[in-house]
Structure formats: structure tokens, C-alpha cells
């Protein structure tokens, strides 16, 4: 696309895209661009999948390029984003049971009429603090976030790139 080399834009999620591509005939796949958030969202699931096992990816354009995240628990067999009569962006998705959801409103969905909290996990890239060859001691970790509802945050640290042969702190 013009001066953009797509391989480097999607390198972080190429394994996920490869899995989707290899199973494309067995999946419901839907996607949309959310203009107001500078995001591209793609959802995929097998026809027999439960809401909990449904997955997706979100790509966000930032000053540092594309950043990617994964989602679980949103079964979107149909997904759309558009502008209403006032020019405000609205986003909706529909599940396999025929329910239609206002995609970015609230803190729960109601698959098949049963309230389900939205679970979220944020994972940073592995950080070497500028020198991968020097051992470091982390004395404290400062977290800043603004939840829009009730939440129960937890913190999980992984050392040496998650190497299972290295003792890791408990979850």
C-alpha cells in the first residue's frame, strides 16, 4: 500500500494470522475499522465455539507504529462500525444466537441472556531496561490505570523472557 511494507506492520501477529489463514474455511471471520480509535479489529471463531473460546485481534495505530493485542470472549459473527446521523461513530456486533450488542458500551455482555463480565489482560513486551546482559533487581512496580467499573487487578512478573528453566514468581 504505497510506501507501507505490510510484513513489518503485522510481524508481531504473523503467527496468529497464519493460524487463521490455515483454518479460514472452518472459521467465522469478521472485521471493521474503528475510525475514532484508529483501530482495526478482527474477530474469529469456529461455528461450534462458545463465547468464551472466541478470539480476536486489535491493531491500533500509534506514534510508534502499529501495536497489536489479542481478545478472547467476544463472539462476533457480524461486526460493523459506522457513523450515526450526528456523525458519531457507533460499533455493533452480533453473536451466533442472534443477539446484537453495542460493542464499546458497558462492562458486560449478555450472551444468550446471561450477564458475562468482560475479562481483560494486558501484557507488555519483555523489557531489558537497556542491557539484556546485566541482572537487575526490581524493588517495586508502579501501575497506573483508570478502570471504568469494578475490577480486580493482579500483577504477574516473568523473568528471562518467561524461560521455564528459570524460577519464576508465583502468579
Segments the model singles out, each with a brief description of its role:
Residues 2-171:
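Beta-sheet repeat architectures centered on beta-propellers
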Amino acid at each position: 500500500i504505497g510506501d507501507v511494507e505490510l510484513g513489518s506492520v503485522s510481524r508481531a501477529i504473523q503467527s496468529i494470522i497464519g493460524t487463521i489463514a490455515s483454518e479460514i474455511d472452518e472459521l467465522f471471520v469478521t472485521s471493521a475499522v474503528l475510525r475514532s480509535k484508529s483501530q482495526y479489529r478482527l474477530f474469529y471463531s469456529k461455528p461450534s465455539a462458545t463465547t468464551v473460546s472466541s478470539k480476536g485481534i486489535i491493531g491500533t495505530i500509534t506514534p510508534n507504529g502499529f501495536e497489536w493485542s489479542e481478545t478472547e470472549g467476544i463472539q462476533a459473527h457480524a461486526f460493523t462500525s459506522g457513523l450515526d446521523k450526528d456523525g458519531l461513530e457507533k460499533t455493533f456486533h452480533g453473536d451466533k444466537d442472534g443477539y446484537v450488542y453495542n460493542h464499546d458500551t458497558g462492562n458486560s455482555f449478555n450472551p444468550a441472556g446471561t450477564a458475562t463480565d468482560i475479562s481483560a489482560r494486558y501484557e507488555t513486551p519483555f523489557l531489558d531496561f537497556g542491557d539484556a546482559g546485566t541482572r537487575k533487581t526490581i524493588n517495586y512496580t508502579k501501575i497506573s490505570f483508570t478502570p471504568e467499573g469494578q475490577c480486580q487487578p493482579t500483577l504477574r512478573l516473568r523473568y528471562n523472557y518467561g524461560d521455564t528453566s528459570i524460577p519464576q514468581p508465583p502468579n
